């Protein structure tokens, strides 16, 4: 098949945005008080002055660059239960919160459990996460506490990476539209593995990139999964090179109170490995939510 570049605001370069505040949304003191009050409200998290800002966040996610960093959520004044309520409440003004997999909860605690990174879910270990997308429209991460060191978040425009591949290696770009085997990490049986393309084009003619190299590689353990072809290996190596190129990637050091929103169709995200504190009450803790916007 012939592949083509896609033009739009979802194509951006990290090098051009690194010193920009255009993607940051700092909360005012009035907004912070409103969030605290909403945490104790019997209503459905009312945000009379902040809600319009969050609606603009949604618009930027769906029709703009595809990512926003909200800053200043007053987590330092909240209990863990209030942080959960704040994360859910803020997210619901952006989209519909959905379970994170069959039988899963709508809110996940991202903490190191000491699990093996090659077999565990990404929110359960402290190892490095390569650039990937989550299987939902939008992923939101509220930082309650950062790590002692490491744990940096990096994002990249998957549209920009796709277009670079089309320009430089159209033969490999074509492979992204063919089925690749993925690992659900739900066990060792055949139902744990499935095949789907990395790139698809939606009804509006926009490219959507669903990429998770860690899950592609771990799928190789499946008894019925064919080994990577040399061309697939080359494609993954080039994607790894491009996504980690500082020209494309934008790094964020999430601090307590930062809430990152990301459109998975047009952006990939990663995390560096991290070292945690020994004391449980100081350890890295993020809250993750999946949203739909349709």
Give the positions of each predicted feature.
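Active-site environment of non-heme Fe oxygenases that use a 2-His-1-carboxylate facial triad
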Residues: 1-50, 55-56, 63, 68, ...
């Amino acid at each position: 098949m012939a592949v083509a570049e896609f033009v739009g605001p979802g194509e951006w370069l990290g090098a051009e945005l690194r010193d920009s505040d255009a993607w940051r949304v700092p909360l005012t003191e009035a907004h912070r008080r409103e969030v605290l009050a909403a945490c104790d409200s019997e209503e459905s998290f009312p945000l009379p002055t902040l809600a319009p800002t969050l609606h603009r966040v949604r618009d930027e996610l769906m029709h703009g660059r595809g990512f926003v960093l909200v800053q200043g959520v007053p987590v330092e004044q909240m209990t863990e239960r209030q942080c959960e309520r704040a994360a859910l409440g803020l997210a619901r003004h952006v989209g519909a919160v959905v379970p994170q997999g069959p039988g899963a909860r709508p809110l996940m605690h991202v903490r190191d459990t000491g699990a093996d990174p090659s077999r565990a879910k990404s929110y359960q270990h402290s190892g490095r996460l390569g650039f990937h997308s989550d299987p939902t429209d939008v992923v939101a991460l509220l930082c309650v506490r950062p790590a002692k060191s490491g744990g940096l978040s990096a994002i990249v425009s998957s549209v920009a990476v796709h277009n670079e591949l089309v320009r430089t290696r159209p033969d490999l770009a074509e492979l992204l539209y063919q089925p690749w085997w993925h690992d659900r990490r739900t066990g060792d049986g055949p139902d744990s593995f499935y095949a789907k393309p990395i790139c698809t084009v939606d009804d509006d003619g926009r490219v959507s990139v669903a990429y998770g190299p860690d899950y592609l590689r771990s799928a190789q353990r499946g008894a019925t999964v064919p080994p990577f072809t040399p061309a697939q290996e080359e494609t993954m190596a080039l994607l790894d090179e491009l996504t980690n190129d500082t020209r494309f990637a934008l790094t964020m050091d999430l601090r307590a109170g930062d809430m990152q929103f990301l459109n998975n169709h047009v952006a990939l995200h990663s995390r560096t490995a991290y070292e945690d504190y020994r004391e449980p009450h100081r350890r890295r803790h993020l809250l993750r939510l999946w949203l739909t916007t349709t």
